[in-house]
UniProtKB/Swiss-Prot annotation:
Residues the record lists as binding Mg(2+) 2: D224, E225
Pfam families xrefs: Glycos_trans_3N, Glycos_transf_3
Chain positions recorded as Mg(2+) 1 binding sites: S92, E225
High-level lineage: Archaea, Thermoproteota, Thermoprotei, Thermoproteales, Thermoproteaceae
GO molecular function terms noted in the UniProt entry: anthranilate phosphoribosyltransferase activity; magnesium ion binding
Organism: Pyrobaculum arsenaticum (strain DSM 13514 / JCM 11321 / PZ6)
Residues the entry annotates as binding 5-phospho-alpha-D-ribose 1-diphosphate: 80, 83-84, 88, 90-93, 108-116, 120
Cofactor dependence: Mg(2+)
Keywords per UniProt: Amino-acid biosynthesis, Aromatic amino acid biosynthesis, Glycosyltransferase, Magnesium, Metal-binding, Transferase, Tryptophan biosynthesis
Amino-acid positions noted as binding anthranilate 1 in the UniProt annotation, renumbered to this chain: G80, N111
Residues noted as binding anthranilate 2 in the record, renumbered to the chain: R166
Assembly information from the UniProt record: Homodimer.
Protein name, as recorded: Anthranilate phosphoribosyltransferase
Catalytic activity, reaction form: N-(5-phospho-beta-D-ribosyl)anthranilate + diphosphate = 5-phospho-alpha-D-ribose 1-diphosphate + anthranilate
Amino acid sequence: MDLKALLRKLGNGLRLTADEAYLLGRGILSGSLCDVEVAASLTAMRVRGESPEEVAGFVKMAREFAVRVPLRIEAVDTAGTGGDGAGTINLSTAAAIVAAAAGAKVLKHGNRSASGLFGSADFMEAVGYNLEVGPEKAAELVEKVGFAFVFAPRYHPAFAKVAPVRRALPFRTIFNIVGPLANPGLVKRQLIGVAEERLLEVVAAAAAELGFEHAVVVHGSGVDEVSSEGATTVYEVKRGSLERYQIAPEDLGAPRVPIPRASDKEEAVAKALAGLRGELREASVAIALNAAFALYVAGVVGDPRDGFELAMRAIQEGVAYRKLVEAVEASRT
């Protein structure tokens, strides 16, 4: 099927198969479609609602265009969609650090914030991490340090082709869903936060289609994280099967605490670091709840409750902050 036929299919409100979505994605990133056609296709999918098959097809395409990290060991990621507009500190990145400190091997994939206060890359840059770490170095850091951060634009340069259209559209597109699933190390284990509840099943089903071994997709009380404030809806993907459930902080042995908010980047960094050091209880608990699920999907623990206990211990004993310092120093040598 040619690209024009795919556009007509979208224009008629029909869903694409995974193979058709792959072809459309290739057409977009290879420059075979003009900006008007790209905008039309992204809008059609957004208005109708992106399907799991379309997301999976786009992810396969994105992986093909990516700069690959040659991982030699299994690793986990905590990348999410972002865009919840909640103004919270960056929990997913801090949680990745804690998970690494507690025994997981982590290849954290992330970007700067496009619309919110603070993205993963903003945090890592603020603490001194070298965002230009290349693929071989990243693989080495995962093995030797247990943590590496890979900056999305460095590893997905082809995405720059569609950036002007994405910026011009007043809504998030399928690329915001694809990014978190397109880790350049092809990780098969991941904690994935989504900003919209409607995306829970879409992303979980796409992860299953993509062959993830163990993924947990979460949306908690208006944030794309496991929430320390109230209930979190979870879709768990394990070897192709999907299970939906809800959890609350107390289910993991955690108190209900507010997720720390920040009004600027400096405050966001300070509160996240205080949480990693165990100096700000609310931040530590919120970070540890997310690290608990990262440790769970990594296979370090058999239950998120055990993961929370392990994560809190890593924070309280200073291991988590030392892991951050180690990772930053290693990225610059």
